[in-house]
């Protein structure tokens, strides 16, 4: 167990915390334009300010990518305060991670629409069909809230996910029903805790 950070190191740690938080906020804002927003039940639909990033997608993608790079650098910078004779406390680390997690927790999915396929297959499991035999379209119907957000390439495709993930997904589906926003949030919280992944991965 190392000694607490001195004043100079503490100020440097706070700058690193702010740097990482800025990166995650950039990712969250950029995801409003470059992210994989749901086709229906989009809570930002009709909100003029929140829909602005979708009209400047190149800028949004740049913001998201810049934020991701900043987040990766912040992780590396944070490491210096977790090693050596003087280290940040557990509470300081927890506050830092929480600050970095929140923007990514509420941001739209980024870089991939896989989460919608996962939610659709989880719903198929919940209603008693075999997700390894039917895809979202034949299992739920083309007009189902989850199917509509699944890329057309995968709407007929059976589940590629393992039994454990589908079991977890069935529980999420039972809890959230057809509320796609609540399902995405639960998916992020539950699966990432189980997988033990970094906050930077929470937006997937």
Residue map of PLM features:
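Alpha-helical transmembrane segments of multipass membrane proteins
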Residues: 27, 104, 165, 195-199
């Amino acid at each position: 167990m190392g000694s607490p950070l001195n004043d100079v190191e503490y100020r440097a740690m706070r700058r690193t915390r702010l740097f990482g938080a800025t990166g995650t906020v950039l990712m969250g804002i950029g995801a409003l334009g470059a992210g994989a927003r749901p086709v229906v039940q989009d809570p930002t639909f009709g909100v003029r300010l929140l829909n602005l990033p979708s009209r400047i997608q190149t800028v949004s993608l740049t913001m998201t990518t810049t934020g991701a790079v900043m987040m990766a650098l912040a992780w590396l910078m944070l490491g210096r305060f977790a090693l050596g004779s003087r280290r940040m406390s557990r509470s300081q680390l927890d506050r830092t991670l929480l600050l970095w997690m929140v923007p990514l927790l509420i941001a739209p999915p980024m870089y991939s629409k896989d989460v919608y396929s996962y939610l659709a297959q989880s719903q198929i499991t919940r209603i008693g069909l075999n997700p390894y035999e039917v895809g979202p379209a034949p299992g739920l119907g083309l007009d189902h809230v989850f199917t509509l957000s699944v890329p057309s390439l995968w709407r007929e495709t059976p589940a590629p996910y393992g039994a454990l993930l589908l079991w977890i997904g069935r529980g999420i589906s039972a809890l959230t029903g057809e509320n796609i926003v609540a399902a995405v949030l639960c998916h992020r919280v539950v699966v990432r805790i189980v997988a033990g992944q970094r906050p930077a991965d929470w937006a997937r």
